[in-house]
């Protein structure tokens, strides 16, 4: 298991938790998802939780995840999508953007599904309030 986050603090917290749980097969790296320090096809599974709405270069992040995923591999995760909950959309615009936690532009559930379908052989996507969840399978070629 390889964990990567832009925040060194988050990686430190993750390392501490892994140590408490005596996990031995986990490595931690601080880095940018828009320029992943891994070889093409390095991973069977890529999991991204609550990240894409915060990434400054979303296009690079989508490309890099696809690049490091093995043929037949799975990309899954969840993140905020606009247009599902007016109250959440307001909060994102007026609070999270101003604090730098979220960075536009944001996907809608529809635009996310279309984007993922251009890259992956199969895409399953759903929403729970303003969060989209997805499971994608990369083609074998």
Please report, for each region that a protein language model flagged, where it lies by residue.
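A short glycine-rich, Lys/Arg-flanked "PGG" loop and its adjoining helix->strand segment in the class I
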Residues: 59-71
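Class I SAM-dependent methyltransferase SAM/SAH-binding core
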Residues: 1-35
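C-terminal lobe and adjacent flexible extensions of AdoMet/dcAdoMet transferase-like proteins
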Residues: 134-141
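A short SAM/SAH-binding and catalytic strip from SAM-dependent methyltransferases
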Residues: 45-57
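Conserved Rossmann-like nucleotide-binding pocket used by diverse enzymes
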Residues: 2, 29, 47-48, 76
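A short acidic, Gly/Pro-enriched loop at the edge of an enzyme's catalytic core
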Residues: 34-46
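C-terminal alpha-helical "lid/dimerization" subdomain adjacent to the S-adenosyl-L-methionine
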Residues: 76-134
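Short N-terminal helix/helix-N-cap motif within the alpha/beta-hydrolase-1
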Residues: 9, 56-60
């Amino acid at each position: 298991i390889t964990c990567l986050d832009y925040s060194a603090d988050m990686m430190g917290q993750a390392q501490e938790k892994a140590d408490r749980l005596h996990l031995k097969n986990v490595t931690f790296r601080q880095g940018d998802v828009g320029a992943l320090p891994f070889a093409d096809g390095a991973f069977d599974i890529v999991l991204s939780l609550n990240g894409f709405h915060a990434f400054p270069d979303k296009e690079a992040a989508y490309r890099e995840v696809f690049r490091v995923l093995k043929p037949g591999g799975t990309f899954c995760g969840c993140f905020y999508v606009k247009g599902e909950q007016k109250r959440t959309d307001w909060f994102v615009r007026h609070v999270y953007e101003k604090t730098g936690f979220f960075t536009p532009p944001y996907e809608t559930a529809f635009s996310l599904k279309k984007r993922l379908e251009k890259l992956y052989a199969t895409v399953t996507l759903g929403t729970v309030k303003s969060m989209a969840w997805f499971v994608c399978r990369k083609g074998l070629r």
